């Protein structure tokens, strides 16, 4: 996971188009969420996927695909750069120890039930307000492009 995270973060910077950069950023967020999930931070891993990949990255991809941006090719990533990157990040991936994805399934369901109860009872109005803000931002992006 560390190698994938490192490669996707550097390719997000080096890509030529914004859509390709956002795709690499989504890969970075998913690999970070998987790393958090495997370390025992189940809730944080799921929130990473929900918040970053599910909402923000899709909104940016939608806006960038509608804006018809012009770009000029600046160059490519050389094979020497990829080799050096792999050599620097490989020791991190070799020393990474996995302890299993899910150790106790009861803890996972208890966390999810607790978060679901909190979101849909106590924070229901804030959740609806956030959904309205997301809908307004999508409508704003659509109106800008017309």
From Swiss-Prot:
Its EC number is 7.1.1.2. Keywords: Electron transport, Membrane, Mitochondrion, NAD, Respiratory chain, Translocase, Transmembrane, Transmembrane helix, Transport, Ubiquinone. Disulfide bonds: none annotated. Pfam families: Oxidored_q3. The keyword Kinase does not apply. It is an enzyme of class 7 (translocase). The chain crosses the membrane at residues 10-30, 41-61, 75-95, 124-144. It catalyses: a ubiquinone + NADH + 5 H(+)(in) = a ubiquinol + NAD(+) + 4 H(+)(out). Belongs to the complex I subunit 6 family. Core subunit of the mitochondrial membrane respiratory chain NADH dehydrogenase (Complex I) that is believed to belong to the minimal assembly required for catalysis. Complex I functions in the transfer of electrons from NADH to the respiratory chain. The immediate electron acceptor for the enzyme is believed to be ubiquinone. PANTHER family: NADH-UBIQUINONE OXIDOREDUCTASE CHAIN 6. This is NADH-ubiquinone oxidoreductase chain 6.
